[in-house]
Amino acid sequence: MRIVNLIILLFLFFQTSYGKSVENSPAYGYHLKVGVPEARRILLKESWRSARIVGGSQVSAANVIPYQVGIIATLTGGASSICGGSLISRTRVLTAAHCWFDGQTRATQFTIVLGSLTIFTGGTRLTTSDVTMHPSWNYLLNDIAFVRISAVTLSTTIQLIALPTTAETSQKFEGVNALISGFGKTSDAQMTFPTSTALHQATVPVISNAVCQNSFKITIDSSHICTAGTGGRGTCDGDSGGPLTVVHNNRRILIGVVSFGPGEGCQASAPSVFTRVTSFLPWINSNL
C-alpha cells in the first residue's frame, strides 16, 4: 500500500510540474481511451478473422510465440481493458505499468491468458491482483510492472522468454530485426468493422534513440528502445505491455515492453516505443 501511495504521489508531482503535458502523454488514461473500447470491440467481433499488429501477419499456432501473454484487466467500476505481457518465469509476467494504473484508472484484477491465439477464449487462464509497478513509474518513464501468478505448467504452447544476460546490458540492438506480437488493432480505422482476437506478429528493425526522437515531442530516454515504423509496421491499440524480442547469441531474448506509439496513429509509419529491458535488469532480477 505504501508503494501504491508513493506512486500516486509521484504522479501528482509530475502532473503539477508539467500541467497539461501529463494528460496529453501516451500512457495517461490508457484504459478509458484505448483498453476499454478495444476490449468491447473484440468481444463483439470475436468470431471474425483479421490482423492485429499493424502491417503484420496472423500467428499460425500457439507454439510459435509461446511466451506471449494476453491480459484482460478488470477496472474499478467493472469495465474490461486489454494489454499484453511476456512470461519470464513460471510465476512471473512482465508487462507495462500503465496496464495496471494509467494515471487515471486503476485495474483491480488481471486475467492472465497463456498458450492461446485468442484473448477472450481458449488457453490457460489465471486471475491475480498481485501486481508490482516500478516504484519510479510516471506517465513517460519506467513503464514496467511485474505480475505474480500461480506456477504454470510449461508445454509446447507455454514457454518462458529469456532475459538478456548481464553481459548483454550494453547492447543497443540497433539495426537488428526484432519481433513484435500482440492482440491489438491493425489499423486506425478498426472500430466496429469485423475483426478477431487472433494473435499477430511483425518483424521490425530496432533504430537508434536519436532517430526515434525526431518523431516525438516528448523526450525519448535512454531507458526506451524504439523500432522503425517503415511500411506502417508497428504496435497499435491493445498491444501495450507486450514483447519485443530478438535472436542474440543464438537464443531469443526479451529486449522491450510495449509502452507507447505515435500520436498521429498506428499507420503513420512512425516509430513504436518500448521500455528497454536491459535498463531494468537489476530491478527485474530482484523480483524474480
Q: How would you describe each model-predicted region?
A:
Residues 2-94, 110-114, 197:
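Protease-domain processing segments flanking chymotrypsin-fold serine proteases, especially trypsin-like
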